[in-house]
A protein has these predicted regions:
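Nucleotide-sugar donor phosphate/pyrophosphate-binding loop at the beta->alpha transition
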Residues: 72-74, 82-103
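Aromatic "clamp/platform" in nucleotide-sugar-dependent glycosyltransferases that forms part
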Residues: 250
């Protein structure tokens, strides 16, 4: 059966939890299960117009279904394995993932990605023709953030910071590519200029133990909190409370978390990398900094904390942009136009 939500019909497929040493082999097994389930849906519910899949993880099932049904495939590529490795492929699994990403770009009638930066990466790494790629950004729903307008957030503030602290907030996975060590290493310079700064770093990941050591080494453990995992509702409240949100990524195909901060009227400081440099315009909707550069990061945070009126104006500009460019209605309309084009072109083509 399926879960119906208006015009959306969602078929849930039970798959085994991850097993074995090879994640790639596990994903291949899951694709076999998904493919079989999809064929059943096709048999029961009749023909459909197109297939849309996201990233290499479901490429196998989507490609198989495409050839079995002679229906066009649209592929969204959010990030690439080579990009995550800063242009390198480390090990056999990375090479297999890279090959599957190439296959998805090859098999797709149109390829969607979320930033011009990613369009360049897909073109360079996979030889995908530039005119086969559509750039449609990710979006954010501002409603949960708007709902906090005027609410008492003192309980959350007491949990994470003092009454007069200036909160510098990060939320995300604690992995190397997010550049969190750069943020931690910016703390001494920021605290020298703004002693009431309070870093709240939320998230889990393989870097968390190392980051704890860096905090100790720098002697800033009384002003830098590694908060661990936080729920979305707590994250939203921290965005509202924070004086700035910092995303110092080394690799970032898009950076939806920056949009969430912007939807909260929170001033942002982000690395000038990947999709982040398209989401945030320096000195207009945020501050951009050099990736991997703690001095640059400290400058961006200090500027935001010290120049409150400028920061407020940038946050206002950013919020307006969220409501227009990054609204889901706008993104849905762009996606529908891609679908219409694919269906039109397929109808005029012999398979």
């Amino acid at each position: 059966g399926c879960d119906r939500h208006g015009q959306l019909c969602l078929h849930r497929v039970n798959v085994a939890p991850q097993y074995g040493d090879s994640f790639y082999d596990y994903v291949s097994d899951v694709n076999a299960v998904l493919s079989e389930a999809a064929r059943r849906v096709v048999a029961e519910e009749g023909p459909f117009d197109l297939i849309h899949t996201h990233d290499w993880l479901t490429c196998g099932a989507a490609t198989e279904l495409k050839h079995a049904t002679k229906r066009p495939l649209v592929g969204t590529i959010h990030a690439t394995e080579r990009g995550r490795g800063r242009g390198q492929l480390y090990g056999q699994q990375a090479e297999r993932i890279n090959t599957t990403e190439w296959q998805l770009s090859y098999e797709s009638w149109r390829v969607i990605c979320c930033a011009n930066y990613m369009a360049g990466e897909i073109h360079d790494y996979f030889g995908t023709p530039a005119d086969k790629i559509d750039v449609i950004p990710n979006g954010v729903d501002p409603t949960p953030f708007q709902a906090l307008e005027g609410q008492d957030l003192s309980e959350v503030r007491q949990r994470y910071a003092g009454p007069h602290d200036r909160i510098v907030f990060f939320v995300g996975r604690l992995v190397h590519e997010k550049g969190v060590e750069t943020l931690v290493r910016s703390a001494p310079a920021v605290l020298a200029a703004v002693p009431q700064a309070r870093y709240v770093i939320a998230g889990r990941g393989p870097e968390s133990e190392h980051l704890g050591h860096v905090v100790q080494e720098l002697g800033v453990s009384n002003r830098v909190l590694l908060a661990g995992f936080i729920r979305d509702d707590v994250r939203n409240r921290l965005f509202r409370l924070s004086d700035c949100a910092v995303f110092p990524s080394l690799y970032e195909p898009f950076g939806i978390v920056a949009l969430e901060a912007m939807a909260s009227h929170c001033p942002v400081v982000v690395s000038e990398v990947g999709g982040l440099r398209e989401v945030v315009r320096h000195a207009e909707t945020g501050i951009t900094i050099y990736p991997g550069d703690a001095d640059s990061c400290a400058w961006g945070i200090r500027h935001t904390l010290e120049q409150r009126e400028w920061a407020r104006q940038r946050a206002q500009n950013a919020y307006r942009e969220v409501l227009t460019t990054y609204s889901w209605d706008n993104i849905a309309a762009q996606t529908a136009r891609v679908y219409e084009r694919v269906v039109r072109e397929r109808s005029a083509t012999l398979w």
